[in-house]
From Swiss-Prot:
Location of N6-succinyllysine modifications: K253
EC nos: 3.5.1.2
Domain of life: Eukaryota
SUPFAM superfamilies: Ankyrin repeat (SSF48403), beta-lactamase/transpeptidase-like (SSF56601)
GO MF annotations in UniProt: glutaminase activity
Description of what induces expression: Up-regulated by P53 (at protein and mRNA level) under both stressed and non-stressed conditions.
Tissue distribution: Highly expressed in liver. Expressed in brain and pancreas. Not observed in heart, placenta, lung, skeletal muscle and kidney. Expression is significantly reduced in hepatocellular carcinomas.
Modified residues (N6-acetyllysine): K279, K284, K329
Membership in a protein family: Belongs to the glutaminase family.
Subcellular location: Mitochondrion
Keywords from the UniProt entry: Acetylation, ANK repeat, Hydrolase, Mitochondrion, Repeat, Transit peptide
Name this protein carries in UniProt: Glutaminase liver isoform, mitochondrial
Length: 602
């Protein structure tokens, strides 16, 4: 990611709004074409200038940024246009969705607003030429370039979601389990509801099934409330009042550990105590608003509601929770001055907060992304809070099935009596499943089966060996077959004169200067075949090196001369005269490429 980070740094003063947060992902360094890589290194160097730089240097910097934006915009246009002079807006949005990004993504607001304005004001019928397209995407060019170059955490998102959809359909046929009946409002839930949404740490989204129907978080709010309390109060203070160990008992037991505090924040007693710690100096309304604002930020400001009917139902039928509250009060488990009834009220309110699978998946992705919301880039929770929360979800999140779930699935998760399961794949994605029928342990029957099938197909289990787990798929990597064919595909496109394919490759994970076993580049092949349009694209759009030598010491110009392609000879001679690559730059480029190759091997 060094080159992209350099670009983001260079563009920050130009008003780029597509910042992204997340923990690092190995082997995701873009292999830009020679010219683009050269511009990026210039931008990175100029980004390190001191505040006392002279005005001409700033002008050069602005010019370099403008050229860099223009080049990336052109490459993006060529990739989507596939040889056409204008792009229909619907074609762009379709290609965008294939990467996993949604047109409603907050990070793409500027781009989508500009395209909407173009449609309203232009008579072109929703068609974008190169200049207009570049203007529309310029504010979000970094994010879009990452998306179309497949530099997100899941590169082949369509293939991955195809597998997810097949698992979803398999699990849909399950009919076991019963809807929770001890809370009257929950008893009215439709047992046929079945939905799954996912959101990656890069903001790639996918939903299947009933994913827009609101449901109450219930116990899924427990890890979120705990994370908020750790972020605001710190680990040491919170764990004076609640433990960290699985209880081995039912989640609603009147039981404390040897220290006289609730076993963990995932059982009712622990969740009630954690609720009592939040904003102790505020009234009930202020406490609820405080937590709701946090939850909204975690969900990227997507759907968040409140079911007053469920809240009233909880209060009317919550005798067990009242008993737990009085038990905690008698054992002096609350901080001094805490109103036990106010703590219970807040607990009931938080359990009655509504989300959809879609907004819930963003909350899970915020946990997967170290506390940074992937679709807004806002830092919501501290890294310490996320680490603690995921640890407890892993050991205590699935009621009495927690040990079995940790064994078979090996991922942090939290279930709820509403039929929801919040699942986190750290550093990769978050998921929210909804299916009201519960098994005998109180977990969603379809939800747990889906999680097990997901981990049996993909190497997401905490202890799957990423290097040697040959029987499982790793969606974080491009397929070995694809990587092995990149050189063949590139050179065949150059051989056959397929400029459209080369345009697509320019924004894929492909270096346009890579060589075959004879050290021949695409420019060598195009020059030998006399494909003038291919040569133009490689030297004008990709700025490839015309001095690359094959195993016989020939450069592309030599091949054009040998096969008497006079137009290509003239074009390459003019390009060689204008192409300058100093020894220092060449050494730096070679060192950077060597380092990238080394990192990809580690």
């Amino acid at each position: 990611m060094r080159s992209m980070k350099a670009l983001q740094k260079a563009l920050s003063r130009a008003g780029s709004h597509c910042g992204r947060g997340g923990w690092g992902h190995p082997s995701r360094s873009p292999l830009l074409g020679g010219g683009v890589r050269h511009h990026l290194s210039e931008a990175a160097a100029q980004g390190r200038e001191t505040p006392h730089s002279h005005q001409p240097q700033h002008q050069d910097h602005d010019s370099s940024e403008s050229g860099m934006l223009s080049r990336l915009g052109d490459l993006l246009f060529y990739t989507i246009a596939e040889g056409q002079e204008r792009i229909p807006i619907h074609k762009f949005t379709t290609a965008l969705k294939a990467t996993g990004l949604q047109t409603s993504d907050p990070r793409l607001r500027d781009c989508m607003s500009e395209m909407h304005r173009v449609v309203q004001e232009s008579s072109s019928g929703g068609l974008l030429d190169r200049d207009l397209f570049r203007k529309c995407v310029s504010s979000n060019i970094v994010l879009l370039t990452q998306a179309f170059r497949k530099k997100f955490v899941i590169p082949d998102f369509e293939e991955f979601t195809g597998h997810v959809d097949r698992i979803f359909e398999d699990v849909k046929e399950l009919t076991g389990g019963k809807v929770a009946a001890y809370i009257p409002q929950l008893a009215k839930s439709n047992p046929d509801l079945w939905g799954v949404s996912l959101c990656t740490v890069d903001g790639q989204r996918h939903s299947v099934g009933h994913t827009k129907i609101p449901f109450c978080l219930q116990s899924c709010v427990k890890p979120l409330t705990y994370a908020i309390s750790i972020s605001t109060l710190g680990t040491d203070y919170v764990h004076k009042f609640v433990g960290k160990e699985p209880s081995g008992l039912r989640y609603n037991k009147l039981s404390l550990n040897e220290e006289g505090i609730p076993h963990n924040p995932m059982v009712n007693a622990g969740a009630i105590v954690v609720s009592s710690l939040i904003k102790m100096d505020c009234n009930k309304a202020e406490k609820f608003d405080f937590v709701l604002q946090y939850l909204n930020k975690m969900a990227g400001n997507e759907y968040m509601g409140f079911s007053n009917a469920t809240f009233q139902s909880e209060k009317e039928t919550g005798d067990r929770n009242y008993a737990i509250g009085y038990y905690l009060k008698e054992k002096k488990c609350f901080p001094k001055g805490v109103d036990m009834m106010a703590a219970l009220d807040l607990y009931f309110q938080l359990c009655s907060v509504e989300v959809t699978c879609e907004s819930g998946s963003v909350m899970a992705a915020t946990l997967a992304n170290g506390g940074i919301c992937p679709i807004t880039g806002e830092s919501v929770l501290s890294a310490e809070a996320v680490r603690n929360t995921l640890s407890l979800m892993h050991s205590c999140g699935m009621y009495d099935f927690s040990g079995q779930f940790a064994f078979h699935v090996g991922l942090p998760a939290k279930s709820a009596v509403s039929g929801a399961i919040l699942l986190v794949v750290p550093n990769v994605m978050g998921m929210m499943c909804l299916s009201p029928p519960l098994d005998k342990l109180g977990n969603s029957h379809r939800g747990t089966s889906f999680c097990q099938k997901l981990v049996s197909l993909f190497n997401f289990h905490n202890y799957d060996n990423l290097r040697h787990c040959a029987r499982k798929l790793d969606p974080r990597r491009e397929g070995a077959e694809i990587r092995n064919k990149t050189v063949v595909n590139l050179l065949f496109a150059a051989y056959s004169g397929d400029v459209s394919a080369l345009r697509r490759f320019a924004l894929s994970a492909m270096d346009m200067e890579q060589k075959d076993y004879d050290s021949r580049t695409a420019l060598h092949v195009a020059a030998a075949e006399g494909h003038i349009e291919v040569v133009k694209f490689l030297i004008e759009a990709c700025k490839v090196n015309p001095f690359a030598k094959d195993r016989w010491g020939n450069i592309p110009l030599d091949d054009a001369v040998q096969f008497n392609h006079l137009e290509v000879v003239k074009l390459l001679q003019d390009y060689q005269d204008s192409y300058t690559l100093s020894e220092t730059q060449a050494e730096a480029a070679a060192e950077a490429l060597s380092k990238e190759n080394l990192e990809s091997m580690v």
